[in-house]
C-alpha cells in the first residue's frame, strides 16, 4: 500500500496565479467589488493551494456536504465552509449573474478574478450549529457566520498578481509549492506541524519537542496563523518573531525547526478546525500534526480533548495526528513536565496566559522556566517597532497598523 502522506489533499496542489503579462487583458472591463481583509487572506490562500483541492469559494453542494457530512461533494474530508457572501441588493445593482466573472479588489487594487458558478442562499443558523456545535452569539465563529450577507457566490478564484508582503513577515511567506521544496531540500521526510496564534512560553516549546520525539520527526514546522486580531491579542509580529527566535537562540537546532505563516482568520471551531488545520498542513508537506488540549477552542464550548477524539470518527485525511496532553511546571519535579508522566497532579502549575500577559504588559521579564528571555526581548522589541509600544493589540494598532499583505497595481 502506497503511503500518500506527502501528497496534497485531493492529490494535486492548486496554484491559480496569473502571469503578469496576462493580467491587464483578463481584468479589463470586469465589474469590481471591494472586499475586506478576511476575504483577501482567503483568496490568497486559495490561489496558492493552502486549501487544496479547493480552487475557489464553495457552491451550495460543497457547503451542504461540509456542514452535514464534514466532506466536500467530491467525498474528500473537509470541515469548515469557505464562502463568499454578498447582499442581494448589491448583486442586483451590479447585475451580477451566474457565468459572469467579477474582479474583487482590496484598497482599490486588483485582487482576484472570481468566476461565478453559482449564486445561492443557505441557512446560517444551521451552518453555525453544525460547524460550531452551538448557535450562541457569544461564540466568535457563530457571530461571524450570522454576520454573513444573505447570498453566497461560489466559483473559482484566480489571483491577479503576486501579493506584496511587508516586513517582518516577508521571509516567512512560503506558499505550499515553495515550502514543499524547502522541506525536501532539508531532508525532512517526517515533518510535524505546530499550529499557533501565540507567543511561545516553555509549555509550547515542550509541546513541540514532545511531538518531535513522539512522531520521530525530522523537523518541526511552526505555522502561525496571521489574520483578524482583537484587542488584547498578541500582535502578529511578536508571535512570528517570538516563534522564530526559539531556533535562533538554540532551543531548537537549526536543522530541526522552521517557521512559515498561514493567512487565516480563526473560526474557533474546536475539533472541526483541528481537522481543517491538519488538511492545510498536509498541503504544506507535513506528515504529522500535533494537537494539544483545547485545540482551536474558545470558552467552554468543547471538551478538553475533543480535537483528539474527532480523528477517530473520520476517514484518514492523509496526515498523522500526534495527540498530546498538557505540559506544565511542577515545583516538585523542579521543571517542565508532562501530564502523562508526572505524578504530582496536585502540585502542578499550569501556564496561565493571562498571568504571563500581565507580567509582560508591566515590562517585567517572566521567570526563565516559563518564558525564554530571548523570546521576551524579541516580543518587547516588536512592541516598540510595530505595536506602538505594546506587544498586545490596541485600538491604535487596529486603526493604524499597515496590512500584512497588499496588492500591487497592474501595469497595462
Regions found by a protein language model. Give the residues of each.
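Active-site cores that bind ATP or allylic diphosphates and position pyrophosphate for catalysis
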Residues: 1-412
Amino acid at each position: 500500500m502506497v503511503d500518500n502522506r506527502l501528497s496534497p489533499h485531493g492529490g494535486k496542489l492548486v496554484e491559480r496565479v496569473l502571469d503578469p503579462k496576462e493580467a491587464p487583458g483578463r481584468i479589463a472591463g470586469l465589474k469590481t467589488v471591494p472586499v475586506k481583509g478576511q476575504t483577501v487572506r482567503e483568496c490568497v490562500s486559495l490561489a496558492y493551494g493552502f486549501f487544496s483541492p479547493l480552487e475557489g469559494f464553495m457552491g451550495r453542494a460543497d457547503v451542504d456536504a461540509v456542514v452535514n457530512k464534514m466532506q466536500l461533494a467530491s467525498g474528500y474530508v473537509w470541515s469548515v465552509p469557505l464562502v463568499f457572501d454578498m447582499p442581494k441588493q448589491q448583486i442586483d445593482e451590479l447585475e451580477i449573474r451566474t457565468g459572469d466573472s467579477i474582479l474583487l479588489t482590496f484598497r482599490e487594487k486588483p485582487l482576484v478574478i472570481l468566476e461565478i458558478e453559482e449564486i445561492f442562499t443557505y441557512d446560517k443558523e444551521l451552518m453555525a450549529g453544525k460547524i460550531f456545535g452551538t448557535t450562541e452569539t457569544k461564540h466568535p465563529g457563530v457571530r461571524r457566520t450570522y454576520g454573513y450577507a444573505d447570498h453566497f457566490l461560489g466559483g473559482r478564484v484566480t489571483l491577479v498578481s503576486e501579493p506584496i508582503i511587508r516586513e517582518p513577515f516577508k521571509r516567512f511567506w512560503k506558499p505550499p509549492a515553495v515550502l514543499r521544496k524547502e522541506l525536501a531540500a532539508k531532508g525532512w521526510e517526517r515533518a510535524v506541524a505546530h499550529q499557533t496564534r501565540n507567543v511561545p512560553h516553555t509549555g509550547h516549546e515542550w509541546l513541540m519537542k514532545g511531538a518531535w520525539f513522539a512522531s520521530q520527526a525530522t523537523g518541526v514546522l511552526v505555522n502561525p496563523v496571521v489574520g483578524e486580531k482583537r484587542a488584547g491579542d498578541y500582535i502578529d509580529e511578536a508571535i512570528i518573531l517570538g516563534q522564530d527566535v526559539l531556533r535562533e537562540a538554540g532551543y531548537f537546532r537549526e536543522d530541526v525547526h522552521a517557521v512559515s505563516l498561514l493567512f487565516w482568520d480563526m473560526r474557533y471551531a474546536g475539533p472541526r478546525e483541528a481537522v481543517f488545520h491538519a488538511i492545510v498542513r498536509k498541503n504544506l508537506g507535513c506528515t504529522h500534526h500535533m494537537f494539544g488540549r483545547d485545540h482551536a477552542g474558545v470558552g467552554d464550548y468543547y471538551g478538553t480533548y475533543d480535537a483528539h477524539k474527532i480523528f477517530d470518527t473520520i476517514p484518514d485525511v492523509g496526515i498523522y495526528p500526534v495527540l498530546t496532553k498538557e505540559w506544565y511546571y511542577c515545583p516538585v519535579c523542579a521543571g517542565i513536565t508532562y501530564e502523562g508522566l508526572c505524578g504530582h497532579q496536585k502540585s502542578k502549575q499550569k501556564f496561565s496566559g493571562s498571568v504571563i500577559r500581565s507580567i509582560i504588559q508591566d515590562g517585567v521579564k517572566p521567570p526563565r522556566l516559563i518564558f525564554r528571555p530571548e523570546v521576551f526581548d524579541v516580543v518587547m522589541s516588536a512592541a516598540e517597532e510595530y505595536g506602538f509600544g505594546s506587544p498586545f493589540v490596541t485600538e491604535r494598532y487596529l486603526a493604524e497598523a499597515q496590512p500584512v499583505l497588499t496588492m500591487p497595481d497592474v501595469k497595462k
